[in-house]
From Swiss-Prot:
Pfam families membership: Oxidored_molyb (PF00174)
Main location: periplasm
Post-translational modification: Predicted to be exported by the Tat system. The position of the signal peptide cleavage has not been experimentally proven.
Organism (species): Methylococcus capsulatus (strain ATCC 33009 / NCIMB 11132 / Bath)
Class in the EC hierarchy, top level: oxidoreductase
Classification lineage: Bacteria, Pseudomonadati, Pseudomonadota, Gammaproteobacteria, Methylococcales
EC code(s) of this entry: 1.8.5.-
Cofactor: Mo-molybdopterin
Name of the coding gene: msrP
Reactions the enzyme catalyzes: L-methionyl-[protein] + a quinone + H2O = L-methionyl-(S)-S-oxide-[protein] + a quinol; L-methionyl-[protein] + a quinone + H2O = L-methionyl-(R)-S-oxide-[protein] + a quinol
Biological process, per Gene Ontology: protein repair
Record's subunit section: Heterodimer of a catalytic subunit (MsrP) and a heme-binding subunit (MsrQ).
Annotated positions binding Mo-molybdopterin: N73, Y76, E77, C131, T166, N214, R219, S230, A231, K232
Cofactor note: Binds 1 Mo-molybdopterin (Mo-MPT) cofactor per subunit.
Protein name: Protein-methionine-sulfoxide reductase catalytic subunit MsrP
């Protein structure tokens, strides 16, 4: 994968999060193979994730403040407005938690989330996140490439797509008591999209364990697609031969296609995609093709009509 030449900006210079400036010193002390010994039985939201290493995946963009990232959320399982999830997601219990990896794989497995956390070295990736509603943020995610998990379960030749299924628990996810969507939430990627080095399996942000409202304890992040493609609070990962029908496509097929690549030239029926409002900014900015990751991912869609396959 080609790396961008974006200037490196120290996290301490671009974020107001008070505790964030200590992370570099912490990581240096905990890096490498010795990090495994630092893991407690489990970690709760707000605790530091040990052994997180930095990579070249940084941006010139300023980070969105932690308070905005944690309190401006689309997570319909906890409510349909942006502020409710941060107030109601405390009811979600993220331990014990398992993720079943199944379907067209040679080595299906039921992972305890704490074992999944230690499957590969954790790294920080600063990514843009673009919502189809026309707003965006910049988030320092913590996780590892989803490809690390995929390689270990060895997909068969029949595996063409990867489906992600969110927990269904109306008692703890009160939004699931409504009929606004067909629960549980489902999303999917082509196998090559899931294997792409930019696609992350995520366990934290800002160096800390994911807040519940941001998809704890494990989610995916696909930075060149609209945010609804990045499934949260995952309990099943299925490898299948036929293209799955995702939740939003099932709900409104004329508005939500399978691919959902960020594309300023293809508007949603309700929202222009030409510009976006970055949280914390007053003026809108032009939206970048593939959310600014065209150099890395455009080849995945060579020859495709992106207006037809939206």
């Amino acid at each position: 994968m080609r790396k961008t030449s974006s200037p490196r900006i120290a996290p301490s210079e671009i974020t107001p999060r008070d505790l964030y400036h200590d992370r570099r010193r912490f990581m240096q002390a905990a890096a490498g193979a010795a990090a495994a010994a630092l893991w407690p039985h489990w970690l709760s939201a707000g605790e530091k994730l040990p052994g997180v290493r930095k990579t070249d995946h940084v941006l010139p963009d300023a980070l969105t403040p932690f308070e905005d990232v944690a309190h401006y959320n689309n997570f319909y399982e906890f409510g349909t407005d942006k502020e409710t999830p941060s107030r109601t997601a405390g009811s979600l219990k993220t331990r014990p938690w398992t993720v079943s990896v199944e379907g067209e794989v040679q080595k299906p497995k039921l992972f305890d989330v704490d074992d999944l956390l230690k499957l590969a070295p954790l790294e920080e990736r600063i990514y843009r996140l673009r919502c189809v509603e026309g707003w965006s943020m910049v988030v320092p995610w913590v996780g590892f490439p989803l490809a690390e998990l995929i390689k270990r379960v060895e997909p068969t030749g029949n595996a063409k797509f990867v489906e992600f299924i969110t927990l269904y628990d109306p008692a703890r996810m009160p939004g699931q008591k409504s009929s606004v969507l067909d629960w549980p939430y489902r999303e999917a990627l082509r196998l090559d999209e899931a294997m792409h080095p930019l696609t992350l399996l995520v366990f934290g942000l800002y160096g800390e364990v994911l807040p519940n409202q941001n998809g704890a304890p494990v989610r995916v992040v696909v930075p060149w697609k609209y945010g609804f493609k990045s499934a949260k609070s995952i309990v099943r990962i299925r490898f299948v031969e036929q293209q799955p029908v995702s939740t939003w496509t099932r709900a409104v097929p004329s508005e939500y296609g399978f691919y959902a690549n960020v594309n300023p030239q293809v508007d949603h029926p309700r929202w222009s995609q030409a510009k976006e409002r970055r949280l914390g900014e007053f003026f809108k900015r032009p939206t970048l093709m593939f959310n600014g990751y065209a150099e890395q991912v455009a080849h995945l869609y060579a020859g495709m009509d992106l207006k037809k396959f939206f």
